UniProtKB/Swiss-Prot annotation:
It is a single-pass type I membrane protein. This is Pheromone-processing carboxypeptidase kex1. Keywords: Apoptosis, Carboxypeptidase, Glycoprotein, Golgi apparatus, Hydrolase, Membrane, Protease, Signal, Transmembrane, Transmembrane helix. It catalyses: Preferential release of a C-terminal arginine or lysine residue. Belongs to the peptidase S10 family. Residues 472-486, 565-575 have a biased composition (Polar residues). Its EC number is 3.4.16.6.
């Protein structure tokens, strides 16, 4: 009976689904560039058994640890758009060159932080759920994420004590604060056996956060950038729609609405009414560009990335359930439709003050060429928001924190403004997807926000300045400012130390040989002396040098004495002078990071000489 019960248990779905970290290990990835494979894990984790809800993740281990361990969770928006956008077009270590080739991203955020990309909500990207079970509210989305993290940290407990940051862009401006609130609540309600998660900060790029402030900014930005000519027939039509939007926003019930139909129509009409005779319209994600889709097929990397992720061998490498994930699309319209069918929750702007006051730092950043979530709307929401005893960027009543000009390696990069644990960064010449345009500049920004200290690692720091004042040192992955340069120096020091240690050991061995030969010769000489005196009738013999040795010896005592010497030497063979003299502490003392130089080198990526440049040519109205 017991045997049958055991057999049933082993064959049960619960047992079959039990997995370990090893099951998620990514052994290799198709098209990977030359060099060591980064340490990766990927696959599905169940978050809702009743609806077959599973979230897909792709995790990259950091290449270096600066002063402490950090994990950054990245989420794209939509709603319903895959975080593989962030992994392969923005902040991840690889970019897709074509559908069969990956290249290193010079400016990836994984140098000092573990990266965890999650396709969420269920049904997004490689995640899946029963077709009638898409989510309708942000509380449910947040609950799934907390469940996911509980299971993920149980699988990978070495990361549970990391400083935790949640980052993303666009409609993730709604996801991120709601998920952060759920984590703060979870930390307050856990029992003594559970570990609180160290939520340190949030980073939101071109985020959809405050509809009340951001809907009106569409026409403000269009006029400011010359997309619409004031007084024109197009302007008249759009102004009428914008007035209808303003009336709806004035309705008290709209204060808690994330999506307002009358306001959504303004952007759609702007795209339609400004279409050129060549049937091109402005790219809503990068106004420097025009194309027939108004940016819905932008950026150019999207097509090869889609073909890459649809390859069978790629899905196999990422440990995907083949029966559930037959393909990949960037955005699942059904996920977005169901989340926007009704109001999914309170606008995230209302959550930010409590999060900041609870000790969570927040960084908002914007690319100045984005229309759909433009910087004017973000700046307006900050201006109106009240937190920590002040309004906006007040440092004291009536006095606002200054905008500090930011230069990166000699070029005007944008500006910083910050007060009371909120930081805002504007990027010049940047689109809706800022890390796509400026990977190294965003890496510089994130390293400073998460307080990376490279003092114990080395490398030539990037030249990053605010108002001409050089900022604390950090390195940003190119040949002139990277920790890889320091790694090479450490390796050279290690090799030099090893050769010195080997030489020292060789000298010690030579000394041992010389001493041994000398002692051996001495005893041979003494033995012969005793043998030559053995014929004297008055001999008393020699006292043994070993305790317990006979006082009277014959002519054969010389050989016996030498034999005892050899035996004594063999008995002490374990006391290896060479081994004693090879002090590995010398190697450890070279630098605090040198002990792990070999291990770090396994994950160091060869740097490229490419400089950041604006990405153009090529062209969603989803918020990615």
């Amino acid at each position: 009976m017991l045997g049958k019960a055991l057999l049933l248990l082993l064959s049960s779905p619960i047992c079959a689904l039990a997995q370990s970290a090893a099951d998620y290990y990514v052994k290799s990835i198709p098209g990977q560039p030359d060099g060591p494979l980064l340490k990766m894990h990927a696959g599905h984790i169940e978050v809702d058994a009743q609806t077959n809800g599973h979230l897909f993740f792709w995790h990259f281990q950091n290449r270096h640890i600066a002063n402490r361990q950090r994990t950054i969770i990245w989420l794209n928006g939509g709603p319903g758009c895959s975080s593989m956008d962030g992994a392969l077009m923005e902040i991840g270590p690889y970019r897709v060159k074509d559908d069969h080739t990956l290249v290193y991203n010079n400016g990836s955020w994984d140098e000092f932080a573990n990266l965890l990309f999650i396709d969420q909500p269920v049904g997004t990207g490689f995640s899946y759920v029963n077709t009638n079970s898409f989510l309708h509210d942000l509380d449910h989305v947040s609950s799934h994420m907390v469940t996911f993290l509980d299971k993920w940290f149980a699988m990978f407990p070495e990361y549970e004590s990391d400083d935790l940051y949640i980052a993303g862009e666009s409609w993730a401006g709604q996801y991120i604060p709601h998920i952060a609130r759920a984590i703060v609540a979870r930390n307050k309600n856990i029992d003594s056996k559970q570990q609180p998660w160290v939520l340190k900060g949030l980073l939101i790029g071109n985020g959809w956060i405050s509809p009340l402030d951001q809907y009106p900014a569409t026409m403000q930005y269009a006029y400011a950038e010359g997309l619409v000519k004031e007084g024109s027939s197009t302007a008249t039509s759009l102004d009428a729609m914008n007035d209808a939007c303003a009336q709806k926003l004035a309705d008290p019930g709209s204060q808690n609405m994330i999506r307002i139909g009358q306001c959504e129509s303004v952007l759609d009409s702007l795209m339609r009414l400004t279409r050129t005779s060549e049937e091109e319209c402005v790219n809503m994600y990068d106004i420097r560009l025009k194309d027939a889709s108004c940016g819905r097929t932008w950026p150019p990397d999207l097509d090869p990335m889609t073909r890459y992720l649809q390859r069978t061998e790629v899905r196999s490498a990422l440990n995907l359930d083949r029966e559930q994930t037959n393909s990949w699309t960037e955005c699942n319209d059904q996920v977005g439709f169901n989340l926007r069918l009704e109001n999914p929750g309170v606008p995230a702007v209302h959550l930010l003050p409590d999060l900041i006051e609870s000790g969570v730092k927040i960084l908002l950043f914007s690319g100045d060429r984005d229309l759909i979530c433009n910087h004017l709307g973000t700046e307006q929401l900050i201006h109106n928001m009240k937190w920590s005893g002040g309004t906006g960027f007040e440092t004291k009543p009536g006095v606002w924190a200054p905008r500090r000009d930011w230069t990166f390696e000699g070029d005007a990069a944008g500006y910083y403004q910050q007060a009371r644990n909120l930081t805002y960064v504007l990027f010049y010449n940047a689109s809706h997807m800022v890390p796509y345009d400026w990977p190294r500049r965003t890496r510089d920004m994130v390293d400073r926000f998460i307080n990376v200290d490279i003092a114990n690692i080395g490398g030539t720091p990037a030249d990053s300045r605010l108002d001409g004042e050089k900022l604390p040192q950090t390195s940003v992955g190119n040949t002139t400012s990277s920790t890889s340069e320091s790694d090479q120096v450490d390796q050279e020091k290690l090799k030099d130390a090893e050769w010195k240690a080997y030489a020292k050991s060789g000298e010690a061995a030579l000394i041992v040989v010389i001493i041994g030969v000398s002692v051996w010769g001495f005893f041979i000489w003494r033995a012969r002396q005793r043998a030559s005196r053995g014929s004297s009738p008055s001999k008393k013999g020699y006292r043994s040098v070993y305790p317990g040795g006979s006082n009277n010896t014959s002519s054969s005592d010389g050989a016996g004495l030498l034999s005892r010497f050899r035996n004594n030497t063999n008995n002490n063979a374990s006391s290896d002078l060479e081994a004693r003299d090879f002090d590995e502490a010398e190697l450890d003392s070279l630098s605090p990071g040198l002990q792990n130089a070999r291990e770090r080198d396994h994950y160091v990526i060869g740097e490229e000489d490419e400089e950041d440049e604006d990405i153009g040519n090529g062209a969603k109205s989803s918020l990615h």
